[in-house]
Amino acid sequence: MTANVRSVPVGTQKYEYIEFGRGEKDLVVVAGMSLCGIMDQAEAIAAAYAMFAEEYTVRVFDRLPDLPVGKTVRDMAADLACALDALGIDRADLLGTSQGGMIIQQLAIDRPELVRAAVISSSACCPNPTSEETFTLWRDTALRRDPVAVNDVSFRRIYTEKFREDCANAFAALSQTGTPEQCERFAVLAEACRVFDCTAELQKIRCPVLVIGVWGDMVLSGKASVDLARRLGCEVHMYEGFGHCVCDEAPDFRQRVLDFYHRCR
């Protein structure tokens, strides 16, 4: 599977994204927050989502490279909307994990014509005690500009201990990545998650939605996914035995997503 890293201008910056597949339909994936971003993982991401490649042209977005202090999830959704407009994409199927799921919620509220169907995984529509504690810890750790510490506190919450042990070599390498400048950016992302609250506007989301969550989510709590689905009146699937990043841990995750898109046609 060949994956290409491309970019589209948004304001004065270049918004990078990973593209693969040659299908007639558009799938837009919005990644969760991370210290180093996802562009170096293009081939691995394309391999993981290979089942979508025949039916879809897949584009995977992170965030703009430069994020000023005070950048909000709504701002990030506006950046994504600008990128999709520039690419001529509308009525796409969307998949967002964690903060990516928050961005998709806001996009579906502000630019509903861009979204045909949405899968929101391990996300939330408003703060809760678990998310407040998590994002405060991540923000404050990142403000110390110590990438090893940021990786440690984030990996421990995102993945189960078993998954980290099974992928010990990969995590050992990843734990040493990042720069002090990327820590500052991570702090902005964490604060945007900490204060995100779109509950007053959720009724504006009219597209079909599948919420996927996991009991025992140490970042946002499983209850956050159940609450989001209840407010939207949509389908929800809750996993057990996996971590916050269930999209990486659950073997049937991607097939479940694809099946939902098919049901929405």
Roles of regions detected by a PLM:
Residues 9-67:
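Conserved HGGG/HGGXW glycine-rich cap/lid loop of the alpha/beta-hydrolase fold
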Residues 75-92:
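Conserved acidic catalytic loop of the alpha/beta-hydrolase fold
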Residues 96-100, 104:
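Gly/Ala-rich beta-loop-alpha elbow adjacent to hydrolase catalytic centers
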Residues 105, 109, 116-145:
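Flexible "cap/lid" loop of the alpha/beta hydrolase fold
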Residues 218-224:
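Conserved alpha/beta-hydrolase "acid-adjacent" motif
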Residues 242-254:
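Catalytic histidine-centered segment of alpha/beta-hydrolase-like enzymes
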